[in-house]
Every structure is written in structure tokens, then in C-alpha cells.
Regions:
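Substrate-binding/active-site clefts of carbohydrate-active enzymes
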Residues: 111-118, 131-132, 136-148, 154-342
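C-terminal beta-strand-rich structural cap/linker in extracellular carbohydrate-active enzymes
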Residues: 597-618
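Active-site rim elements
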Residues: 303-311, 435-448, 494-504, 600-603
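Surface-exposed beta-strand/loop patches in extracellular or lumenal glycoproteins
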Residues: 22-31, 38, 566-581
Length: 618
């Protein structure tokens, strides 16, 4: 089994207060008795580009008989007057593998490195009196699935780095957000990258703020009741990841990579979960992130590349072991031995199956997004859109149950109309004349109002609402369907849109709907969802449905009726109201109330064009 205490670069003081660093790395099948030698090359960051100062080389010892062929050495940081070596600061290191006197792999980073430099370099820090991070999140509890509103963001595009995200957390709270889904934040080779070709799985990227920056972000989120979800790319890696590079170069049997499930890259294999080392690596990785960084779960990218069935060795095994491991941490305690850890599967071919058969309590699914985009593009309204707002109708499970152990927990799909994988939703309504540097057209933001009924639908749907950063003020970047320009081109948010008429209107609506989602139990309930299936509604461009929450002892029963008008004209909508009383409109709070004398009475409601209304009996 992988022991994280014997790998990485670990600074320590000796008995006379001198610094030493212990280096350790597993290279299964790479052994001294085959003629291999391994050295680590170390340099102080301040000396990295100084003429005449070379890295210091140290050869590691192979531990004969170790399960995964551990190589290690403890190095004294003896001060060198001609350089910064031996002084406090950041040190960079990399490994070099030789066979006899010949280089086999000239340069590879530590696959267990806890910090990274720019590019293919690992790092460690020497400082006087290092202190553990001062966490302040002892009382934080992960939100229940039904209470979640998720905000997906690319840290660099959102606001530069981890500190930039911290600066905007109170803004996100105003949108009703209580879960951040961070696109990959671990070390990558390129300066501009989405992060889906990881190089250092244990190291937050230094360009985003490194380990300290990410811990500060998670702690700041927890102070505000916001959970943090990491995008976990466990099906494929960068070709220069150590367990690709070394074994491609040596021809030795690869302990991690191989053909397993649906390969993401056609020209090279991904991670192979039939191999014990692969399974152990990612279980230990999740264990580390949950404890060292206090993250609250994972959005597993491209699950088809990891999944070999509900009792397989890949994805199902990983999420089960991670679920059981999370029970030791108080923030996940859901009572009766249940963990609230967030494990979200991107298994687009079968989101229903993955939530029904594995320890995944949520999943991405493109059903609502696809229907919304088709409606926007072709200017029609479909009953299928209403059904997409009710996952129960589509056969999604409400609960995962392990018949063998008796374990159960609630599950729900993510609901979204935008994600990082798709062009901006506002672009479906028309394109502007100006283009970005790749020649992609921006969306026409003058048609922002067409988004409004979709936003109201998103916050009033069953399932877990997810926003893609910038959606709330009409971000309008284009996006290529393929090619390096898709994920190697930076698209920073146009924060200036927040101040114009379109941005103000959209942000206001997101804030109102986020507040309603937070306050109105019926919008978070697993209770009754009733679609008013009336062909006349569809002809007028209208969808209407009802959300209900049963009385639970502490709260009375609650009923809301939602009207969505996708047309360019105000619409008068008739339907039967289920209870007598005064029905008040909640979105704007300025529209006339509807007075119902008896249950089942039909009454009209005028719904504004390209907008919606939510009525509640008061």
C-alpha cells in the first residue's frame, strides 16, 4: 500500500538544528539490479536562472523488497556560499533516470510532490519555525444535497488566483451559492490551461496561489457556509506525468497507465484501474485532499474512462472507499452513519445508472442544457423542457441504497444551462459583430432578456442548480468545438458587464431567485412536482408547474406555482389553484395578488414576456 509519509520531499531538522530533506518516490519495476540509477536535481528558486549555478545532484537508494520499489535519500542542505543553497526559501527539484550511464528520462516531476514550480518542476519550502495552517472551520458542515446551489469556475478566468476568488465570495453568496466547483487547480505544464491534463496531482498550481492560497480559499469558503468541490481528473494525464514518461522511455511494464475503459485520448492510454498501484494512488490522493485541504468532495471528470461497472475495480471502488473514508471527518456527518461528502460523476452517457449503482450522490447531465439550447436556437417551447425540470419524471433515483450494507443517502442530478464545456447560453439568441482573437463571435448581449425565463426555471427546478461563472451577468465569450484554442486560450470574465443594463438586470434576477431558493422549502423539496400539461400554454410560449413541500412538524406545508413565459408578448395564463387564499407573486413582488375563494378555482395570471412569476399562497 502507498505510504504518503515516505514519498514527496519532506524537510526536517536534525538534532543540531540543521535542515535535511528526505526525498522518496515509487517507481514499480524500476530497480537497481536492472542497472537503473535515479538522481534528484535540486536548486534554490533564486538561483534558477543564474549563470554558473547548477542544480545539486543526489543519487537515491533503491529499497530492495519494497512493494512499489521505493527510491529515497535524505539530503543535508549544507550552505553553499556561491549560491542560495542552504538558505530559507523555495527549492525546485526534478528527477532524472539513468540506465547505466545513459539518460533514460532526463526530466520528470515528482508524482507525489506537494508543491510545484512553473512547468515540470516540483518544489518544497524551507522556513524558520514553520507553522501549520490556522484553520478556522471547525464548525462547518457540508450542505445537504437538496440545499445546494453550485457555482462552477475556472480560477484564473474568474479572478486571477485563489485570493481573487476569496475577494468575490460575498458576491457569490448573494447569488444563493453554497458550493464552489473549481475546475482543476493542480499543477499543469502550460501557463494557460483548463487543467484536464494533470502533471502534479498532489500540488495546487503555484500560478494560482499554491498550497497556502488554496487552503486560504477553502477556509474562507467554510467561514461563509460554502463547500468546495474539486474537479478530479483521474481518467487521463499529461504525457509528461511521471508514470507516463518514465515507462514510455524504459519500456518497463507500466504500473498505472493502460487500456481500461473508454480512452479519452485516441493516441495514448489512460489510467488502468485493474492495476493495484492505480487504485491505491487515487484512493490515497482523495484521502490527502480531504484532510490536508479540507475539501468537501470531488467532481469526477470523464467517468467513462474509469468505469467498469457497479462492482468494478475502477470508479465504483474509488467512490465507495472515499465515502467510507470521509465518515471519520465531522463536517460530513449526516447522522446515522451517513456521510454528506459530495461525489459528483461526469458520466454523461448514463447519469441515472451511475447514481443508482455507485456511491455518487450527484451527477452532471446535459438533458436540461440540450433542450434549453435547442429551444433558444429554434424559438419554440416544449413540454420536454418542463419534464427536464423534474428528474423524478425521467427516472432519476432519489436515494442510493446498498442492499448488502443497508447504507442509503439522497442523490440528485445537477441542473444547468451553461458549463465550461459549452458556448455561452446568451450566444444562442444571436451573435455580435465583434470577434475574439480566435475568430469566435461574441454573443449579442442586447438580447439578455431572452435568458430570464431559463434562469427562473433553473432556480425552481428539482435537482441541484449549477451556474457557470459569468452566466449571472451575461458573459458572452465564444468557444471552439475542438482544437488547442478551446482549452489553451484564456477567456477572463468581463466584470464590467456587471455594471451595464443587461448585467444589472440579470444579476438582480439571479439574486432574487437565489434568495427564493434559499427561503422557500418547496423549491428544495423532494415533494410533489406537477406540470400543467395544457397545449394552449405551449402555443402561447408558456410553461407552468407546481412545487410542493409537505408539513414536517417544524414547518407547515408549502405550495408554489411557477410560470415561465418564453415569448415576446405578455401572456394570460389560466389554471386551477390548489388551495383557497391570497396568492402573492414573489419574483418582483409588485404584480397583483390572485385571490382564490375555493380549492380548484380557475383564475388568470398575466406573465410578463421573456420572464416568469412564482406565486405562493399566503
Amino acid at each position: 500500500m502507498i505510504n504518503l509519509d515516505e514519498v514527496d520531499a519532506s524537510p526536517q531538522r536534525d538534532a543540531v538544528d540543521n535542515w535535511h530533506v528526505r526525498f522518496g518516490i515509487y517507481l514499480p519495476g524500476i530497480t537497481f539490479n536492472k542497472g537503473y540509477a535515479l538522481k534528484v536535481r535540486v536548486i534554490h528558486e533564486a538561483d534558477q536562472f543564474i549563470h554558473g549555478i547548477e542544480p545539486k545532484d543526489f543519487f537515491l537508494d533503491w529499497a530492495n523488497g519494497s512493494a512499489y520499489d521505493l527510491w529515497s535519500i535524505t539530503v543535508a542542505l549544507t550552505p553553499d556560499p556561491a549560491s542560495h543553497f542552504g538558505q530559507n526559501g523555495t527549492y525546485l527539484y526534478r528527477y532524472e533516470l539513468l540506465l547505466g550511464n545513459e539518460d533514460v528520462s532526463f526530466w520528470f516531476a515528482d508524482p507525489f510532490g506537494r508543491a510545484a514550480g512553473l512547468g515540470t518542476l516540483s518544489a518544497f519550502i524551507i522556513e524558520d519555525n514553520p507553522q501549520p495552517f490556522p484553520w478556522t472551520d471547525t464548525g462547518f458542515s457540508v450542505p445537504e444535497i437538496d440545499d445546494m446551489v453550485v457555482y462552477e469556475l475556472n480560477v484564473r478566468e474568474f479572478n486571477r488566483d485563489f485570493q481573487g476568488v476569496i475577494d468575490q465570495l460575498d458576491y457569490l453568496l448573494g447569488l444563493g451559492v453554497n458550493v464552489l466547483e473549481l475546475m482543476p487547480v493542480t499543477n499543469v505544464k502550460e501557463d494557460v490551461e483548463w487543467g484536464y491534463t494533470p502533471l502534479g496531482y498532489f500540488a495546487p498550481d503555484d500560478r494560482l496561489g499554491g498550497p497556502l492560497g488554496l487552503k486560504s480559499l477553502v477556509d474562507a469558503c467554510h467561514q461563509r457556509g460554502i463547500a468546495v468541490l474539486l474537479d478530479a481528473v483521474y481518467a487521463h494525464t499529461h504525457p509528461e506525468f511521471a508514470y507516463c514518461l518514465v515507462y514510455d522511455a524504459t519500456g518497463e511494464p507500466n504500473p498505472m497507465m493502460g487500456v481500461f475503459a473508454g480512452e479519452f485520448f485516441p493516441d495514448r492510454p489512460g489510467t488502468d484501474y485493474t492495476k493495484e498501484f492505480t487504485r491505491d494512488y487515487f484512493v490515497q490522493l482523495n484521502h490527502y485532499w480531504l484532510r490536508e485541504y479540507h475539501v468537501d468532495g470531488f467532481r469526477y471528470d470523464y467517468v467513462p474512462g474509469m468505469y467498469d461497472g457497479p462492482v468494478g475495480q475502477g470508479y465504483a471502488n474509488l467512490v465507495y472507499r472515499t465515502y467510507e473514508d470521509s465518515k471519520a471527518l465531522a463536517r460530513f456527518d449526516g447522522g446515522n452513519g451517513r456521510s454528506k461528502i459530495i461525489q459528483c460523476a461526469e458520466n454523461l452517457p448514463d447519469p441515472i445508472g451511475i447514481m443508482s449503482q455507485t456511491y455518487s450522490n450527484c451527477a452532471w447531465q446535459n438533458g436540461l442544457l440540450d433542450r434549453a439550447r435547442d429551444m433558444a436556437q429554434w424559438q419554440y417551447v416544449s413540454a420536454d423542457f418542463a419534464h427536464r425540470l423534474d428528474p423524478d419524471f425521467l427516472g432519476y433515483p432519489q436515494v442510493f441504497a446498498n442492499a448488502a450494507s443497508g447504507e442509503t443517502f439522497p442523490v440528485a442530478p445537477f441542473q444547468y444551462i451553461e458549463s465550461h464545456d459549452h458556448p455561452r447560453f446568451i450566444n444562442e439568441f444571436g451573435l455580435a459583430r465583434n470577434r475574439d482573437l480566435l475568430g469566435e463571435s461574441y454573443g449579442d448581449r442586447s438580447r439578455f432578456y431572452k435568458m430570464q425565463p431559463y434562469i427562473i426555471a433553473l432556480y425552481t427546478a428539482k435537482g441541484i442548480p449549477m451556474l457557470w461563472s459569468g452566466q449571472e451577468f451575461g458573459e458572452n465569450w465564444g468557444l471552439l468545438d475542438w482544437g488547442v484554442g478551446r482549452n489553451l486560450f484564456e477567456r477572463p470574465l468581463h466584470w464590467e458587464y456587471f455594471y451595464d443594463a443587461a448585467g444589472k438586470a440579470l444579476v438582480h434576477l439571479h439574486r432574487v431567485m437565489g434568495g427564493l431558493r434559499r427561503v422557500q422549502r418547496a423549491l428544495r423539496s423532494r415533494g410533489y412536482f406537477y406540470y400543467y400539461d395544457d397545449p394552449a400554454h405551449l402555443q402561447d410560449g408558456v410553461i407552468a408547474f407546481r412545487r410542493e413541500a409537505s408539513a414536517d412538524g417544524a414547518h407547515p406545508a408549502e405550495c408554489l406555482i411557477v410560470f415561465l413565459n418564453f415569448s415576446d408578448s405578455d401572456a394570460e395564463v389560466w389554471l386551477p389553484f390548489p388551495t383557497a387564499g391570497v396568492w402573492a407573486e414573489l419574483v418582483d413582488g409588485t404584480r397583483p395578488a390572485v385571490v382564490i375563494a375555493q380549492a380548484g378555482q380557475w383564475a388568470p395570471v398575466v406573465v410578463p414576456s421573456n420572464y416568469g412569476s412564482v406565486y405562493k399562497c399566503t
